[in-house]
Swiss-Prot record:
One of its GO terms (biological process) is glycine decarboxylation via glycine cleavage system. It comes from Yersinia enterocolitica serotype O:8 / biotype 1B (strain NCTC 13174 / 8081). This is Glycine cleavage system H protein. The gene is gcvH. Disulfide bonds: none annotated. The modification N6-lipoyllysine is found at residue 65.
Length: 128
């Protein structure tokens, strides 16, 4: 059973979003996603300052099993990336909701959050 924190919003493509305040959101992949991928060996993150659109691929997680695109759950500007992942990509496995975050985004349209799933709805999609 995957851990799905109730205070986050989720995309059906297995990204999570956490409000950090002032229209800034942290993004990562869910515990379920990292379990499917297996041990991370590399994470290719978006460039700080780049603009992303909701649903567009903006990063890649490479594991011992596969490479998987990571999609922007909301539109906006990438304002930070988790530099720790360069030397420690395994943080995505060991702490997907905390130290294994991927990037921070300054939302250009916070109403897009309304189309994301809450924990209960996300759990329902992964238990199908």
């Amino acid at each position: 059973m995957s851990n799905v924190p109730a205070d986050l919003k989720y995309a059906s493509s297995h990204e999570w979003v956490r409000a950090d305040g002032d229209g800034v959101y942290s993004v990562g992949i869910t515990e379920h996603a990292q379990e499917l991928l297996g041990d991370m060996v590399f994470v290719d993150l978006p460039e700080v300052g780049s603009e992303v659109s909701a649903g567009s691929d903006c990063a890649v997680a490479e594991s011992v099993k596969a490479a998987s695109d990571i999609y922007a759950p909301i539109s906006g500007e990438i304002i930070a990336v988790n530099a720790e992942l360069e030397s420690s990509p395994e943080l995505v496995n060991s702490a997907p909701y905390t130290d294994g975050w991927l990037f921070s985004i300054k939302a250009s349209d916070e109403s897009e959050l309304d189309s994301l799933l809450d924990a209960e709805a996300y759990l329902a999609t992964i238990e199908e």
